From Swiss-Prot:
Protein name: DNA-directed RNA polymerase subunit beta
GO BP: any one term: DNA-templated transcription
UniProt-listed InterPro entries: DNA-dir_RNA_pol_bsu_external_1, DNA-dir_RNA_pol_su2, DNA-dir_RNAP_su2_dom, DNA-dir_RNAP_su2_hyb_sf, RNA_pol_bsu_bac, RNA_pol_bsu_CS, RNA_pol_bsu_protrusion, RNA_pol_Rpb2_2
Any single Gene Ontology cellular-component annotation: DNA-directed RNA polymerase complex
Family: Belongs to the RNA polymerase beta chain family.
Function: DNA-dependent RNA polymerase catalyzes the transcription of DNA into RNA using the four ribonucleoside triphosphates as substrates.
Molecular-function annotations in GO: DNA binding; DNA-directed RNA polymerase activity; ribonucleoside binding
């Protein structure tokens, strides 16, 4: 039944039927944990991999002994970094030891290796003043993968790929003639026996003795034209290095370096773990019949007798005592199964070795050698440490290769299984830490080359570590990663939810991942292993669908990078569901039957029903209660945070829920945030973890509160914690970040208590929109095609008003002709244009500005012109140089206006770091209040989006029997075909809740039912169907049937009409074609494309057409003359030759064709060579800005607004302005159900 739940400072009435068992993990721990791992272990691993660096004579030896991040010498705090456009980083100091073996001299030094970017508490990085997020990447895990294809005759052909983390690939394939081939590193294929011979089994008998008799092996041997180990080596060498003289030694060293050199071939821990899992013996011999006795080699005991079936325990026992091949009987033939000879070390050692940190299986021959030669605990421990790389090899070993071949042979008999590459057991996550580690490794290996060179060149006696090490390549590779990697993205900061989701995003794109074009349907599709790990709902529409995903709410990432999800264990003996929580990866989960979270259970934890619905891989089946192994932890564990915020998700169609999830991320923070009346109960957790709320660091008592500061007196030592609040800061997306205190003086706070509200939060809960009184009714056609009719009350009361802050900057540089100057003294500008400019030439704070107003007065020196004699005389008399400057002031761009809220000035003199050639930098921040207006895009949480079509006076809006007018009317036709019924349930429940004064929590898949809602409506005194008689505001007559009325949570999205509306008469033109530019950003025109020209041709509108193709576009002289004619009120002159025609002629001339243009009388028309020649004689400049091209090149580098990948992410056809689409417009683009 409905019960109160306390969330932060608010109590919600919850309809949840389930007790919360485990808590949701911290939502940004993916980022934080990964970065901490990198600082603690990741960096260390890279240094260990590269140690030691030796010169070519192996005399000098350079080692990295240790490192530390110097946290005390961080130059600027996070806030200062944002202000100064610098990077939030700490110096990395590395201790380096140089050993000269000849003289035995050791030199140790601490070397500075560049500033290393630090992660903020919110899981972001500040790079050049911009907040960025490193997105986790989903990649194929290193390992062995087997696949099957069917040939024309219906025969199964098996193939396999051995994928390392880095190094050469091995690919096996079988053809229709039963011959198995191998490709080494994508070269031409060889019979597989050549590889086996080269590995050491030289003759045919050795091969058959090792792998057992097998038809496919026989066929391959017949095909193979080499007969010995040496011949095979030479054959491989010829294939891999064609054109070089083959010798046995060079072939041997080639193979060594390809596969067995840890510097060239790296499996990584994950790869080794996947190899051992896939190639282990016990998984393939389980439930098979042995053809001979299996004997323990140590004790001589018979583990399995001839003809006995091997059960799971026996199979594990066989592998763990070091047996590596077993013959089994399949369909009257004997098949030899070979493993890769790895065992669990704890079965062989009777003392505790936890401190050695060995979690993987170890290579049995290496272990046996240690145990045979040493007996004391000390010496064994010592040897294990010394030989750790032999016990757990980083590279592939011969036994791995034999095991992969054996697996390939076994597949034909149904032993082993093929793999599904889209299964999350075979895809892993590379989070920040690992991506950084790989990048750091690239930098270090480049540095290693430099060090080796310097070792040989410099004098070995006086050399120091400092002189050897060049930190440039390391610093550059880190900088490159943060600045321009596809996975380092400009943070989406529209609201707290979009920040949180961005940090939890998983991308399959990026370096080493997929590309949009190659990704097929399978990769993008929802897979059964996504359950509880990746959200099946939240993914962008458009070209990236399914390639960019979101982490599910309860998911965690394990040490190998696989995503795990929690389950409750079922005690099968007592048939009780326990509260023990187990995290499982996707391939572990496949072995169990898992019940759903809302399966009815009595108070003792027993199942109520005897038959239970469970998941078994991709099937949902019904089984007896005693067969269930685990149970889901929570009904919302399969969806992401944004999706979990949609109430009644279970009643929405999936594609609409997808739009709902994505649009919540685009909601603009409003002036007065309001938490949803109908929520899901996750709003508090999401806001707290998003990092926009200041939380108490320690328990204590609030001693002081004002608008921008809160002080808390600590209980522990009586000291004071000070929390500064952010006031009206600009976010990455230009929305407003503002924090307001929600605690009072004297209030007792615990550690983690929310002290203040941030943007889009209300009492610590995420509040993206407003609860609006609305009805599903049409009104005079203003609801056509999802449009919304809103009441003027929403405008008057600032219900949907938001603040937007834009940043403009101007820099004074040194030019060839002298320095630019920021000044109030601007040529040809009247005094009234300077009324708000102070004496420095910079606008005053608080001034109201409109488009075209000067923000920063700046003049640039012009080239000195040749002086006339009179001027020289005047100059000689007055000594006054006529100032040759032109006005390059920063002005407010078209369509922008607002109030100056902040001005920041940085100068060289004050010691601010500015880019080279810049003397002074001025930044102005303009804030504007944007009220809701016609053309703004609004949406609910269920994918029900629309554009405002009309603002109606409140007296004309339909009103309720008690006289309250509706605030919004939505079209009822928007509901049935879209199948997002959740919005209707939300409206009904909101209607009842507002009357009862409740805030409600209805968690996804565990929320209010239809009966609950009817119950609430009755309690509130409304009709059971939630409908009401409405009256027409204009006439006072009732409408002819009752209408569904209630409260819906409505968001205002970041697609505001003010940012899209745009007009141009004249403006900038493209340099080559002389046609107007396109798009609002360039102050461009509307393209009149090919199809539009056809339309005019079809009408026969010849003059209009000629005008559009010439004077309105690229007839340089004609357009200026036309402009003058319009200004003077004369007739428009005849068009001339368009520039495109000249370009065409130039291209034909480039093909050596002599082209002449003739008039009616066969006289040649002379074309001017260049645009400049034509413009020389014209005295009017219609480009608006005389140096448009110059000013656009002033800024060599601008922080990209969004990064490229993001740009393509949000291709939402409904919101594209026409000029974004260029001319590949299709009519379907405008159809809502695209």
């Amino acid at each position: 039944m409905v019960h109160p739940v306390r969330v932060g400072k608010r109590t919600r009435m919850s309809f949840s039927r389930l007790k919360e068992i485990g808590h949701m993990p911290n939502l940004i721990e993916v980022q934080l944990d990964s970065y901490n791992w990198f600082l603690k272990e990741g960096l260390q691993e890279v240094f260990e991999d590269i140690n030691p660096i030796q010169d070519y004579t192996a005399n000098l030896n350079l080692e990295f002994v240790g490192y530390k991040l110097d946290m005390d010498n961080i130059k600027y705090s996070v806030e200062e970094c944002k202000e100064r456009d610098s990077t939030y980083a700490a110096p990395l100091k590395v201790k380096v030891r140089l050993l000269n073996k000849e003289t035995g001299e050791v030199k140790e030094q601490e070397v500075f290796m560049g500033d290393f970017p630090l992660m903020t508490e919110q899981g972001t990085f500040i790079i050049n003043g911009a907040e960025r997020v490193i997105v986790s990447q989903l990649v194929r895990s290193p390992g062995v993968y087997y696949d099957v294809s069917v040939d024309k005759t219906g025969k199964n052909l098996f193939s396999s790929t051995v994928i390392p983390n880095r190094g050469a690939w091995l690919e096996y394939e079988t053809d229709s003639n039963n011959i198995i081939y191998v490709r080494i590193d994508k070269t031409r294929k060889l019979p597989i026996t050549i590889l086996v011979r080269a590995m050491g089994h030289g003759t045919d008998t050795e091969i058959t003795n090792f792998f057992g008799e097998d038809e496919r092996l026989k066929a391959t041997i017949e095909k193979d034209n080499t007969k010995t180990h040496e011949e095979a080596l030479l054959e491989i060498y010829k294939r891999l290095r064609p054109g070089e003289p083959p010798t046995v030694d060079s072939a041997r060293s080639l193979i060594e370096s390809l596969f067995f050199d840890p510097k060239r071939y790296d499996l990584s821990r994950v790869g080794r773990y996947k190899f051992n899992k896939k190639l282990s013996l016990h998984l393939r011999i389980v439930n098979q019949i042995s053809t001979g006795d299996v004997v323990n080699p140590e004790t001589g005991e018979i583990l399995v007798q001839k003809g006995e079936k091997i059960d799971r325990e026996k199979a594990v026992q066989i592998q763990q005592c070091g047996i590596n091949s077993v013959d089994i009987e399949i369909e009257d033939t004997t098949l030899r199964v070979i493993g890769n000879n790895f065992v669990n070390i704890n079965n062989f050692i009777d003392f505790n070795i936890d401190d050695l940190n060995i979690k993987e299986s170890v290579y049995y021959p290496a272990l046996k050698q240690i145990l045979d030669n040493y007996s004391s605990e000390e010496s064994i421990r010592e040897q294990i440490k010394k030989n750790i790389h032999n016990l757990i090899p980083k590279h592939i070993i011969r036994d791995d290769i034999y095991a992969t071949v054996s697996y390939e042979l076994g597949l034909a008999y149904g032993v082993g299984h093929t793999d599904d590459i889209d299964h999350l057991g075979n895809r892993r996550l590379r989070s920040v830490g690992e991506l950084l580690q790989n990048q750091f490794r690239i930098g270090l290996s480049r540095m290693e080359r430099v060090v080796k060179e310097r070792m040989t060149i410099q004098d070995q006696e006086v050399i120091t570590p400092q002189a050897l090490i060049n930190i440039r390549p390391v610093a550059a590779s880190i900088k490159e990663f943060f600045g321009s990697s596809q996975l380092s993205q400009f943070m989406d900061q529209t609201n707290p939810l979009s920040e949180l989701t961005h940090k939890r995003r998983l991308s399959a794109l990026g370096p080493g991942g997929l590309s949009r074009e190659r990704a097929g349907f399978e990769v993008r599709d929802v897979h059964h292993s996504h359950y509880g790990r990746m959200c099946p709902i939240e993914t962008p529409e458009g070209p990236n669908i399914g390639l960019i995903n979101s982490l599910a709410t309860y998911a965690k990432v394990n040490e190998y990078g696989f995503i795990e999800t929690p389950y409750r264990k079922v005690n099968k003996k007592e048939k009780i569901v326990t509260n023990e929580i187990v995290y499982m990866t996707a391939d572990e989960e496949d072995e169990y039957l898992i019940g759903r979270a809302n399966e009815p259970i009595d108070e003792n934890g027993k199942f109520v029903d005897s038959k239970i619905t469970v998941r078994d891989k991709e099937d949902v089946i019904v089984v007896p209660a005693e067969d269930v192994d685990y149970m889901d932890l929570s009904p919302r564990q399969l969806v992401s945070v944004a999706t979990a915020m949609i109430p009644f998700l279970e009643n929405d169609d999936a594609s609409r829920a997808l739009m709902g999830s994505n649009m919540q991320r685009q909601a603009v923070p409003l002036l007065k945030p309001q938490a949803p009346v109908v929520g899901t109960g996750i709003e508090y957790k999401a806001a707290v973890d998003s990092g926009v709320l200041p939380k108490a660091r320690n328990a204590g008592v609030v001693s002081y509160v004002c608008a921008n500061e809160i002080r808390v007196r600590r209980d522990s030592d009586g000291g004071t914690d000070i929390y500064r609040l952010l006031k009206f800061q600009r976010s990455n997306q230009g929305t407003c970040i503002n924090q307001r205190p929600i605690v009072e003086k004297g209030e007792i706070v615990q550690q983690g208590t929310v002290l203040a509200d941030g943007p889009s939060t209300d009492l610590g809960e995420i509040a993206l929109g407003k609860n609006i009184r609305m009805g599903f009714t049409t009104w005079e056609g203003y609801n056509y095609e999802d449009a919304m009719l809103i009441s003027e009350e929403l405008v008057k009361k600032d219900v949907f008003t938001s603040i937007h802050i834009e940043e403009y900057e101007s820099e004074a540089r040194d030019t060839k002709l002298g320095p630019e100057e920021i000044t109030r003294d601007i040529p040809n500008v009247g005094e009234d244009a300077l009324k708000d400019i102070d004496d420095r030439g910079i606008i005053k704070i608080g001034a109201e500005v409109r488009a075209g107003d000067i923000l920063v007065g700046k003049v640039t020196p012009k080239g000195e012109t040749e002086l006339t004699a009179e001027e020289r005389l005047l100059r000689a008399i007055f000594g006054e140089k006529a100032r040759e400057v032109r006005d390059t002031s920063l002005r407010v761009p078209h369509g922008e206006a607002g109030i100056i809220v902040d001005v920041k000035v940085f100068t060289r003199k004050n010691g601010d770091e500015l880019s080279p050639g810049v003397n002074k930098l001025v930044r102005c921040y303009i804030a504007q209040k944007r009220k809701i207006s016609v053309g703004d895009k609004m949406a609910g949480r269920h994918g029900n989006k629309g554009v405002i079509s009309r603002v109606l006076p409140e007296e004309d809006m339909p009103f309720l029997p008690d006289g309250r007018p509706l605030e919004i009317c939505l079209n009822p036709l928007g509901v049935p075909s879209r199948m997002n019924i959740g919005q209707v349930l939300e409206v009904h429940l909101g209607w009842a809740a507002s009357e009862l004064g409740w805030h409600i929590a209805t968690p996804v898949f565990d929320g209010a039912t239809e009966e609950d809602i009817i119950e609430c409506l009755k309690k509130a005194g409304y009709r059971e169907d939630g409908k009401t008689i409405l009256y027409d505001g204009r006439t006072g007559e009732p409408f002819n049937r009752p209408v569904t009325v209630g409260y819906m949570y409505i968001l205002k999205l970041a697609h505001l009409v003010d940012d899209k509306i745009h007009a141009r008469s004249t403006g900038p033109y493209s340099l080559v074609t002389q046609q107007p530019l396109g798009g609002k950003a360039q102050f461009g025109g509307q393209r009149f494309g090919e199809m539009e020209v056809w339309a005019l041709e079809a009408y026969g509108a010849a003059h209009t057409l000629q005008e559009i193709l010439t004077v309105k576009s690229d007839d340089v002289v004609g357009r200026v003359k036309t402009y003058e004619a319009i200004v003077k009120g004369e007739n428009i002159p005849e068009p001339g030759v368009p520039e495109s025609f000249k370009v065409l002629i130039k291209e034909l001339q480039a093909l050596c064709l002599d082209v002449k243009v003739l008039n009616d009388d066969n006289q040649e028309i002379k074309l001017k060579e260049s645009v400049d020649e034509e413009i020389e004689n014209l005295d009017v400049n219609i480009e608006g800005n005389e140096d448009f091209v110059l000013s656009s090149q002033d800024n060599d580098y601008e922080e990209p607004e969004e990064n490229d990948e993001e740009d393509e992410l949000n291709l939402d056809y409904d919101d594209l302005t026409l000029d974004d689409l260029k001319d590949d417009l299709k009519i379907e683009d405008f159809n809502d159900e695209h």
